[in-house]
Amino acid sequence: MSIYDVFSGGNRPFDKEEWAAAKQAQRKEAYELIDNTCSEMMASGDSFRQYLDVQGRFDRYSVANAILVSAQMPEATQLKEYSKWKASRVYVNKDAQKIIILEPSKEYTREDGTKGISYNAKVVYDISETSAKDRRQEQEPKSMRELVSALIDASPVPCVPVDELELPAYYDSSQQTIFVKKGLSEEVLFVSMAKEVSAAVYDFKYNESRDASDFKSFCVAYMVNSRYGVDTRGFDFSRLPREYAEMDTQAFKGELGTMRDVLGEIQSDMYKSMEKNKPAKNKEQER
């Protein structure tokens, strides 16, 4: 008798081939789910908005993984592997819903000599499916003044208030300036600025004109507003760009990828700004 008989499942040896087959099936399922969800998103404003909500919360997730979370548990807020939850002394419910995402694995060389990265399927669980469901971290509320100030810092161009302007805010690429109309409510100011800052980032990063990036800037603004709890009822996704319905999945994900990158750039700069301007008392409490 071996001492290893005390381990549960000791009578059933680990079958590497069976494990690999299960992982391959999960990976295949994930890619099929991505393609199917993209098809839904290209035709449905509700599905598209649902994806944006997820990508806004998980701004560091790849587009593929945000799509997967959107399809499986769009209300998720904090995802970890079983082992990571356990290491934090948090226990996953027995009947917890599994969410499959993809993680990069090994680099390989394609037949044409270019490099590629293979991906493995990974199972994660949302905090709502664990013993820590009542300990979810609520985002510290930010004042509209803090948010507007951070957005100004995140802008690659100056933001200049003016008395006369047809729109609430407007990015003028020829002057490399965002003009903002005076007298706006705080929320209208933030919402309109978020779109124009996005347009400016698109201009600088992708050399896209304000007109060319209009809808994508609209989407980035929605994600920024959604993340910080600003009212998003004014955003309408009932009519998506006509070209989306004609795109293949890869091209569509490319569009989403630029939105995710612009969002990440704005979020990163806003975070740095708010950390820099955080009251000294709050910084001391965090130590």
Features from the language model and the residues they span:
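N-terminal accessory/interface modules of nucleic-acid-binding and processing proteins
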Residues: 1-287
